[in-house]
Amino acid sequence: MIRIVRGALVALSLCARAAIGSAQHSTDGGAPAVNAPLVAPDSIAPYGRVDGALLRPASYTYQLTLVRNAVQTPLGVRAVQISESNAGGVPGWLIAESRTGSAVPTTDSLWVSRTDLSPARWAATIDRTQLGVSFSRDSAFGAVQSYRGRASFAAAVPAGALLTGGMVERVIELLPLREGYRAAASLLLFDLATPRALDAEIAVERAERTRVGSVDMDCWVVTLRAGVLTQRLWVTRDAPRVVKSEQATAGGILLSVLQ
């Protein structure tokens, strides 16, 4: 299974990039296959509408490291860029990502609405596999092209579904984080070119002062859970931004730290 879990859990975003193709794992320390049954969050409200007008153009660079038995192995660099862009003639945002220095280079380009960050169009690559998706209010239409050929699909999409790592981070930064905050979410998974939504939960685990580089920062530690999979993100309390994240994988702990 060629895994594109970036955001949503590779490159430290649980949601959005799971399987394209057949049973072959990524070689860069990606998330394990999602085979266990996923448990829906109990009766908590979804995270609701975020104010996309609060987003600003920005660029972030994260160093990726795999930690196993106290040994750290660099996995390359993940770059995220947010810019103003039009999708179908409608003003919006482009959340573009690239991962370099790893065994398999990957890219994501996600166009979202300016008002609430709902997805409009998504283009992604992992090595020679390509994904293209267009979204309506409650549906997705797209195609996957790989060495195995081309497959198209159409599927229902829950409102507020999360896709890429960059989208997950931007949404979490715009949430009203506080002690005890919990909200339900949906992660969109592509398995053998068939989209399916996974129930997930976003929760503030604790407040913590953490060091990023040479600077100590006051952060919320936010967990994103879908069944047996968990990602933690450190979000600064002032001028919120994701400065660190971690995820347990089959190969060790995958760390992502803002440079």
Regions found by a protein language model. Give the residues of each.
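Surface-exposed beta-loop interaction hotspot
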Residues: 147-181
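Positively charged n-region of N-terminal signal peptides that target proteins for export
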Residues: 1-6
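Boundary at the C-terminal end of the N-terminal hydrophobic targeting segment
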Residues: 18-23
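Acidic, serine/threonine-rich low-complexity disordered tracts
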Residues: 25-139, 144-146, 180-259
